[in-house]
Regions:
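Short, small-residue-biased leader/transition segments that mark boundaries at the very start
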Residues: 3-4
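Terminal, non-catalytic domain-edge segments
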Residues: 94-121, 368, 372, 395-542
Length: 542
């Protein structure tokens, strides 16, 4: 079957363009060993690029051709430059690391990759006898490293905002690096983002889209009205993924009850109900109420309504959330892998609102979904993308929450079976762009101003894996998954800037189809879901 092929005959390639210590960890999509590793033996890799990507060449479904780039060099007559590598099988995780070290490479790690100003980074390099007299350079400032067993480490105060590149010199003329980011303060960053949305991304003109949260063009410093030619207008409209801005503001208000935020939310709630839904709660993403009827949109709107109940205690919002989900289940059944179905939030809201009949009906719907997910197991149906992390993570998130609400062991067992498949999307490279960030490679095209294909490291939906890991930790008591969840949501903070602006995706490869990458897309579009899940993982706000 296609699912079998994807999980057994395809791999998630985790690439580290780490100079003399470059590697590729090709992890089988199904999580089943053996996997394939490539580690550089001689030479240097500076970056990688993607080619053969467009709507007619794999569309969103394949990653393209990956090319590892050599450094620029000038060879005189008679000169030579040798590049060689090892290819080996491995069992995943620690076994990959061990086999890399056995082949005389090194492993670099940091205690974390995004720091608040003033925090201390612990940078560590592990290797064999070849690793000696290590020197660390922080943005070209030299810092001594200390030896500890077969590893070397340095503690560095992160005192300057922005990206910090740690270059590590080791062995005979060899080097590698790690990339970290320093931000001012997480709470301030989120506060500035919320204030920016209220001030700049809510429609104020008196047309039919008034009070909607909209895409913002960071280059033009204005709302993008979705009125110029683009590849997919439904990914830039006034509904759908943009509802994440409303969910973020509602969660933020629960921590910081600011009057302006509540006023903005009340206007937005009215816009959603009166402009994007009909009397029967059929949900659209544009005010003309035409275009695709998309199951994803119902879940996000319902999530928003349930959050609104929490901040107003107005039973009407509990009803709106319930009716929106009922509309989805009536139209789409119980087999769709929607992103972010509010299991705990929805049921607890209906319980708190004393809506016992509705609680029972919604629980029955959720059990029907959960039983479908259990039956399917690892045989995920294709969605808007044939196979991706945002099919697997929502399944795990749903089953874990259903276990929390019902106490039925089968749902936890079903989630456990899917965890290796979810974890296979993540790599361990020493960069805030890459470490535990799920492989995704199409969102920059569909949602960005540059309409650029290629690896998005990070893309905000990578925080779904963070949410799944957090919930798994809550259900099992395994704290290591909580730490991994925190790392994922923290690394996604790079999509938010000190002035309150944001970016929907970072295009990571050096080039895609020959066009320069390595940039944050200029549209603030749908990335605020990253902060929604940050507040789940760090503050426990469902």
């Amino acid at each position: 079957s296609d699912v079998y092929k994807r999980q057994n005959m395809r791999a998630n390639a985790h690439i580290w363009e780490g100079d003399n210590a470059a590697y590729v960890n090709a992890t089988r999509m199904g999580g089943y060993a053996p996997h394939l590793g490539l580690v550089l033996r001689e030479g240097e890799i500076k970056s990688y690029e993607i080619s053969e990507r467009d709507r007619n060449k794999g569309n969103s479904h394949t990653r393209g051709i990956i090319s590892l780039n050599l450094p620029d060099m000038k060879l005189m007559p008679g000169d030579e430059q040798v590049f060689s590598w090892y290819i080996f099988s491995h069992k995943g995780g620690d076994d990959f690391r061990q086999k890399l070290l056995e082949r005389e490479s090194v492993w670099v790690s940091c205690n974390k990759y995004v720091f608040e100003k003033g925090e201390t980074a612990l940078v560590k390099i592990s290797g064999g006898q070849m690793v000696k007299d290590c020197i660390l350079k922080k943005n070209d400032v030299t810092i001594p490293m200390k030896k500890q067993g077969t590893a070397w480490y340095a503690e560095v105060v992160m005192d300057q905002l922005g990206e910090v590149r740690f270059d590590i010199l080791y062995g005979a003329g060899k080097k590698t690096h790690a990339n970290c980011l320093v931000i001012s303060n997480v709470n301030d960053l989120i506060k500035k983002r919320v204030e920016f949305i209220v001030a700049n991304q809510q429609m104020k003109s008196s047309n039919t889209r008034r009070d909607a949260y909209m895409v913002y063009d960071n280059e033009k410093n204005e709302i993008y009205l979705n009125n110029t030619h683009n590849c997919n207008p439904v990914d830039r409209d006034e509904g759908a993924e943009r509802v994440g801005m409303g969910v973020l503001l509602a969660k933020y208000y629960q921590l910081h009850p600011v009057a302006e935020v509540k006023a903005s939310l009340l206007r937005y709630a009215s816009f959603l109900r009166n402009r994007l839904q009909d009397a029967d709660y059929k949900t659209f993403s544009s005010v003309d109420q035409k275009g695709r009827n998309r199951a994803y949109n119902y879940v996000w709107v319902a999530d928003f309504y349930f959050q609104m109940y929490k901040i107003t205690n107005d039973k009407q919002y509990a009803k709106h959330g319930y009716m929106t989900l009922r509309s989805m289940f009536k139209q789409f059944g119980h087999g769709f892998y929607a992103i972010g179905i509010p299991v705990c939030l929805g049921l607890q809201t209906l319980k708190n609102a004393d809506m016992q009949r509705e609680y029972q009906e919604l629980e029955n719907d959720y059990i029907a979904v959960g039983d479908t997910f259990l039956k399917n197991g690892l045989n995920y149906p294709a969605s808007e993308v044939n196979y991706e992390q945002a099919i697997v993570a929502p399944s795990v998130m749903f089953l874990l929450q259903l276990y929390m609400e019902t106490g039925r062991q089968k749902y936890l067992d079903g989630a456990k079976i899917q965890m290796p498949v979810l974890e296979a999307f993540n790599g361990k490279q020493p960069s805030y762009h890459l470490n535990e960030i799920a492989v995704r490679h199409w969102d920059g095209y569909w949602f960005g101003k540059r309409e650029m294909w290629g690896d998005t490291f990070p893309h905000y939906w990578s925080t779904l894996s963070g949410a799944a890991f957090y919930l798994y930790s809550q259900c099992t008591g395994d704290h290591s998954y909580k730490e991994r969840a925190e790392n994922i949501v923290r690394n996604n903070l790079c999509l938010f800037f000190e002035d309150g602006k944001a970016s929907c995706a970072y295009i990571y490869p050096n080039k895609v189809n020959g066009v320069k990458g390595g940039f944050y897309d200029p549209y603030a579009n749908d990335q605020d879901w990253a902060l929604v899940y940050y507040l789940l993982v760090q503050n426990g706000i469902y």
